[in-house]
């Protein structure tokens, strides 16, 4: 796939996330996708490595049951024929504590046959931990 096609796929995934359309996100990943929000420790239920579409669905279910997104704005995207890197301005409120986290997220996607085969996301884990703690 071309860099432009890969960016288009990521933007459609981001738009699906904004709508809460996990099925559309799952359509964009390979059956054996390797998906992870990288973090030391388990401060948030969505942290850790997931495999396959069921793992990605669990990631979004855990995230959605924990956080209410207030802002998710891609601010920079770079791509080539196999990879996409993005920076996303993010703000969300913990459903349990009412505390808000605001940060930039960093996403790396690797493509295979036009679909996302690998994802790694990083965030301010200390801020996430503080937001989720009661």
Tell where the protein language model's regions lie, with residue ranges.
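A beta-strand edge to alpha-helix "cap/lid" segment located at domain peripheries
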Residues: 1-5, 61-134
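Short, low-complexity N-terminal intrinsically disordered segments enriched in polar/charged residues
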Residues: 1-31, 131-134
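Hydrophobic pocket/interface hotspot
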Residues: 10-13, 25-26, 33, 52, ...
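A structural signal for well-ordered alpha-helical scaffolds and beta->alpha junctions
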Residues: 3, 18, 22, 53-56, ...
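Short glycine/serine/threonine-biased micro-segments
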Residues: 18, 50, 96
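Short, mixed-charge, low-aromatic patches
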Residues: 11-20, 43-47, 63-67, 87-89
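Hydrophobic alpha-helical core bundles mediating ligand binding, dimerization, or RNAP-core interactions
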Residues: 10, 14-17, 29, 37, ...
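A solvent-exposed, acidic/Ser-Thr-rich amphipathic alpha-helical stretch
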Residues: 24, 30-82
